[in-house]
Amino acid sequence: MKFLVNDYALIWNLLFQASFSEGIYKLKQKLWDTYRNEYNETFKDKDLIMQDPKNFIPNNDIIYNIILENKNYEKLRKQVDKYRLEVMRLWDKNKKITEELYSKIIRKEIPDYTIFVVNKELNIIDHVCQGSIVLGKEIDKKAPLNILLEINMSIIINNIKKYNIEDNKFKKAIIELAVLNEYATSLCGKSCYLSGTPDLIGLKRWLYPYWLMYMGISKEQFLSYMMRDQISFDVEKYAYEKELRKMNLEEFIDFCIRNQKYIIRDKNIKKNPET
């Protein structure tokens, strides 16, 4: 994982994301009034910048040069450099736990990522293309680890295949179990299994027994995990699926979609889902 401040990426986002200060708004308005054609052409640069930032050369650099020479840009750049170091410190401090998220929970090869760091005032996490994310979000002083959750949610969501609207809720719920619940629990040292999207809480409770099996938790350990996470179910009414621990996250999502009639049930009838 590389955290990078790139002038072209930074300027592009200052130009085309919401203005977070009056000074930036006025500068953008002046550029638009004076160099409208060049401004429009600059919009097309986004993907080119993210795909090859080191070798990117704009077709027309008028807009970029004006901002680079602006007296306030150096100050903005220093703020972003400082923010980048703050994010990197958080990432490096929790690197081992994050690596285990991918090796032990996701179990699927994920490409290397470059995180293009921009002004935190822009309030964005934008998955631009495979291997590239634009990050500009305030680090919550009360919950600084949340930014790691958001980065990894963005990466994983965009590296798991797409599903139809009805089945996509399983994808969202299971990725939340992986990141917002299990990964967050490891980061914080206490259970975070009651966190996440309110609309998915019910589905995640149905998935929870199978999630424990996917995690390789033995049936004898279920009770201690239920106590830890404050989620209960009747252990004896679930057939233990040994094959789940051999799957990756995408395969587990497929399994849950395929067997949803057994997983979501009003009465916990012991049945054997198809693997």
Show where each model-derived region lies:
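N-terminal low-structure segments adjacent to metalloprotease catalytic domains
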Residues: 1-78, 82, 273-275
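Post-HExxH zinc-binding segment in Zn-dependent metallohydrolases
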Residues: 1-42, 160-229
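Charge-rich, solvent-exposed alpha-helical interaction surfaces
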Residues: 30, 34, 38, 62, ...
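Pan-zinc metallopeptidase signature
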Residues: 43, 197-275
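Auxiliary, metal-adjacent structural segments of Zn-dependent hydrolase domains
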Residues: 70-131, 186-193
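Short, solvent-exposed loop/turn segments at secondary-structure junctions
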Residues: 120-124, 140, 161, 182-185
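Short pre-active-site segment immediately N-terminal to the catalytic Zn-binding motif
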Residues: 133-148, 163-166
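Active-site alpha-helix of zinc metalloproteases
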Residues: 141-150, 154, 173, 177
